[in-house]
Amino acid sequence: MTFKKLLLICSLFLVLPCCAKDVVNNKLDYINLDYWKNYNDEILINHMQTLYQNNHDLRIAALKTKQAEENIRLAAANQLPNASFDGSFSRVFRGPKTVFGNVVIPKYVQNEIFLPLNASYEIDIWGQNYLTRKSAKKQKEIAEQQERATYIYITSSFAADYYNLVKVDALEKNLEKIIILQKDIVAMTEKKYNAGLAPINELLEEKQILVKFEKDMNTLKENKKLLNNEMVVLLSQNSDKEIEHTGFDTLKYPTTPDSLSTTVIQHRPDLLSSESFAKKAGLDVRIARRDFLPKFILFGNLGFNAYKWNRIFAGETFLANAGIAPSWDLFTGGARLAKYRINKYEYKKAVENYEKTVLTSIQEVNDALVETKTTKANLDKANEEFNIECEKHALSERQFNIGDSSKLDEMRSEVNLYITKQRNIAATIDNVISTISLYNAVGGIDYTKTENL
């Protein structure tokens, strides 16, 4: 027998860690690392794992789910009997005399010792407590979907900030080259002006262009700092060190589909949450309807009622009773009817909200698809524009080499090339971020896998 007990205990110790690991893995699935691996960026994956471990919003969402689980246990407790011990000890001082009909009891002083064990149980004839527990379970489903929505929002927001940081960094490096070139142009134009070969307007225009580029650089540095600060908060880091990120030239991102079935919205947490809320509201209506019915409570107590310490557990002090107590609120001033109507209207609101969420979900998916198509088309045009500018600059270099144009013309052509590169960088990152927007719109599923569509 002892061997069997030891075997059972050991098996429990083996099973419990596995169960705990499953819970962790289930939460880690909310991050959906398989999707983020489509970007082929180990730095991003590492940041996502740090988010999972440290982000405070994710922890708060997890705690809300745990609260909902405890509410289920609270509702389940109402389906079980209640037991309590309500003992008392008192010293009784009676008046001069106590009259019971013809019997007169003179004044006296005595101890009263009462040691009862009380129990009660509400008979769930109408299933009200059972429905309350089902309602609590629906609330847990809502909390779980809200937690999943938080994961999708936080990871998508971080990824968007991450690639915006990549964009700002690439734009900043490219703009540094533009500013260096523009400073050289200003210096050469100033020499031409001093030599009487250029008007003052030409020099002022070049200086004005340089000032504009320097203002753009200040804006980029500000945006870079703001993005870095926001990402530090998301990662729950205490330092303001620069967030590590990949380079622009190594970017990879998934291909987006041309169209998606409307059934893809079934994965969205807001839709699942609104569906669970509508079901919960329906259960609450049924619960409120049962408030009109009587309740039946079984009760009883078992214990001792003695007057002397040395006779507490004597046979004659034993006390026990049991019974059933029907309870029916005949008039409450319309409170129960008002509560029923409130829950009924809440149910109707929940149904309307669910139908609205369906339409909103379809709209957001379609909007995200339009965004991906638009950014892809803009990227194609940006690439085409950049290629044309490359050809123009190559032509400008050939003209300079054969003496058909000045060095200033060749440098201005190079500036235009880098300016076009700026637009190309922005269009590329916009296309990357549109893939993240689509991921968010479809409910955090990997849309690159056909089985999810």
Model-found features: residue ranges?
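Bacterial N-terminal signal peptides
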Residues: 9-17
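Sec-dependent signal peptide recognition
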Residues: 3-9
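Periplasmic alpha-helical coiled-coil/stalk elements that build and connect Gram-negative outer-membrane
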Residues: 138, 145-261, 371, 375-378, ...
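Outer-membrane beta-barrel architecture
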Residues: 73-74, 118-120, 287, 325
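Hydrophobic, lipid-facing positions within transmembrane beta-strands of outer-membrane proteins
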Residues: 47, 113-119, 260, 320-324
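Small/polar (Gly/Ser/Thr/Ala-rich) solvent-exposed segments
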Residues: 59, 82-109, 120-149, 272, ...
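Acidic, low-complexity, intrinsically disordered peripheral segments
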Residues: 31, 423-453
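Bacterial Sec-pathway N-terminal export signals of envelope proteins
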Residues: 19-71, 249-279, 330, 358, ...
